[in-house]
C-alpha cells in the first residue's frame, strides 16, 4: 500500500501534448487509409485505436502483452528497425527520438542515438509514404537521462530527403 495524495483535483489533469499528437495521427491515418500503419515506440494505446481502422503494428524495445484484434506487437529497437528499406507507407513515432541513446528505457547509451533513430525512420518509410513525428522543440539541450530538446532545424536536417507537409506545436499550457 502507498498513499495517493495528489488526485483530488477540481478538474481532470490532461497531458495535452500526448492527447493532441495521438489524435492528430489517428485522424491522419483514418484519412489516408493505409493498408498497414506502423508505430515505433509511441504508445500501444494509440496503436490499439488505429487497429480499429487498419492493420496496426506496434514496435517497442520493451515488449507489451495485450490482446487487441488487428494489432501486431513487435519487439525491436528504433536504432536497428527490422524492416526493409523504403517498405512502409505509414509510420508514427511520437515523443520517442528524444529518448534514444540516453539509456532511460533500456536502450544503449549513445550520444548519436536520436540521429541514428531518425536515419532508421527515414530508411524504412517508402517514397511517397508518411512519417508522423513529434518531439520536444526549443533551445537545444539534453536533460539527462530523461530526454533531449531539439531545435526544429536539427530535425529538418535529419530528414533532408523528406518534404515537410505540416508543422504543429502544442505549448506547455496545452494551446495548439
Residue ranges and their predicted role:
Residues 119, 146-171:
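Short alpha-helix
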Residues 23-24, 31, 36-81:
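Class I SAM-dependent methyltransferase SAM/SAH-binding core
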Residues 1-33:
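Class I SAM-dependent methyltransferase Rossmann-like catalytic core
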Residues 79-91:
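A short acidic, Gly/Pro-enriched loop at the edge of an enzyme's catalytic core
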Residues 102-107:
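Conserved catalytic-core motifs of eukaryotic protein kinase domains, centered on the activation segment
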Residues 111-112, 133, 138-157:
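Acceptor-substrate binding/catalytic loop of class I
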Residues 92, 97, 101:
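A conserved beta-strand element that flanks and buttresses the S-adenosyl-L-methionine
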Residues 109-130:
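A short glycine-rich, Lys/Arg-flanked "PGG" loop and its adjoining helix->strand segment in the class I
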